[in-house]
């Protein structure tokens, strides 16, 4: 969800790479195999439509939340049906919370809402750099002339690593290959006082932008992050798994399956955030069999984990996943409900 890309002896059988055409299946413990049948058949158009309308109502309700994080997630989810939700997304541009404003502009950029983009010009004077960068993204992505210089300035000099990461993401999304040298230069420009684990996160996000712009050499470094050697590296491992799924890096499939199944000497696996990121990314690459990982966390006591599970169900997108999402739309936590709504719209649109 709002851009939330973070958090992770005996091994189960790791994987089966089944054919030369690139299909694979994650090994699944027999005791955890999913039932083939589900309660509701969402392949029926009317049934799927009813679930979609439930998701839409959830997004509408979430957009009115007093919690700005829920409002921001609702706006991002609204992007899955952007034309229907265009007024709701535009309303976010004037939200009192800077995060909500930024997400609204980023959604206009990513969904290329050309009718809404001119409304972002006023945000170029926003007090928050996150909003100004999002406005530049929205305008540029929709073909409106705008000075991109603040993106480069933020990438190279901003005190916040999160701001630098946002700048890198936008440069990657805009698709201008001339940004690659700047992104490469930024790898050496991080503040010396910064937390090394957070610098690693930033470098992975810069690498993702460079991969999107055609620099495939960066894939190797991202794959290397799939091998955490200490607890401080687990967040980077989860992010690396997410990035490799986004860029469809099939060479990393075996590494990701290993990451999801690894157990230390005490039999403990990596944290839920890591394993769910792997399951989500493998589903993006059509690797079957990872739903049992998601099932094991869908009932977690932690809402953030249930929300991440909902996102993964949306990526898997099969009938069993839609049945689980139908239940998560009734979750007691609003963050989980809006995550489930987002996932339903993604799954049904497939």
Segments from the language model and where they lie:
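Residue-level signature of alpha-solenoid helical repeat scaffolds
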Residues: 76, 106, 137, 169, ...
